[in-house]
Amino acid sequence: MPRPANPETRSRLLEKGGELVSNRGFNATGVQEITAAAGVPKGSFYNYFDSKEAFAVAILTDYWDSVVATYGAILDEQGTPPLSRIARYFAGLAEFHHRHRYAVGCLIGNMALEVTPTSEDVRAKLAAIYRDWSGALAACLREAQARGELGAGKDPQQLAGTLIDAFEGAVMRTKVERSRAPFDNFERFVLPTLVT
C-alpha cells in the first residue's frame, strides 16, 4: 500500500523543481534532478504528479498564485488612481526581475515558448493564466475609463492583452541583455502611449 502524500514534500518538489525549470528550462530539467534538489526519492515524484507535464501545470499554478499574492493587490488599491496602479504593478514585476538579475525571465513566457508546442495541458493552463492576468488589468482599465482617465474609445480587454504582450517582450529582452533598459522603455514609451 502506498504511503499517503505529504503536502510538505509536494511543496518542496514544486519550489525546488520550479527553481530548476526557471533557471535551466523545462526540457533540460529531469525528474531525477527535481527530486534530488527536493531531497526526496525519485519514485516519490509520481506520488504527487501523474507526469512531468502535470508537474509543469502545477509549477505554473504555483508561480501564478505567487504573482497574484505578491502584486495583485496593487491593482485593487482604491486610494490610488487606476492608471497609477497599473504603472506600479508593472514596476513591481520589473523589480522582481531586477532582483533576479534578469537571468530567469518569466516562467509563464518561458513555458509558453518551450512547452506549448508539445503539451495541450500546459497550453490550456497558460491560456487560463493569460485570461486571468488580462482580466485583472482590464478591470482596472475599465475603472480608469469610468473616471475619465482613459479614452472611451479604447477597449480595456484588448488594451490589457497588449500591455501583457509588450511587457512579456520586455522580459525576454531583459533576459538576453541582462539590463533594465527594456523595462525602462516599456515604462517610458509603451505604457504612456497605450493608456493615455
Describe each model-derived feature in a short phrase:
Residues 103, 121-132, 136-139:
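Short, solvent-exposed amphipathic helices
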Residues 13-21, 93, 167:
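Short hydrophobic clusters on alpha-helical segments that form packing/core surfaces
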Residues 88-96, 131-147, 157, 166, ...:
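C-terminal peripheral helix-coil segments that are non-catalytic and often amphipathic
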Residues 9-18, 34, 59-63, 67, ...:
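Generic hydrophobic, amphipathic alpha-helix propensity
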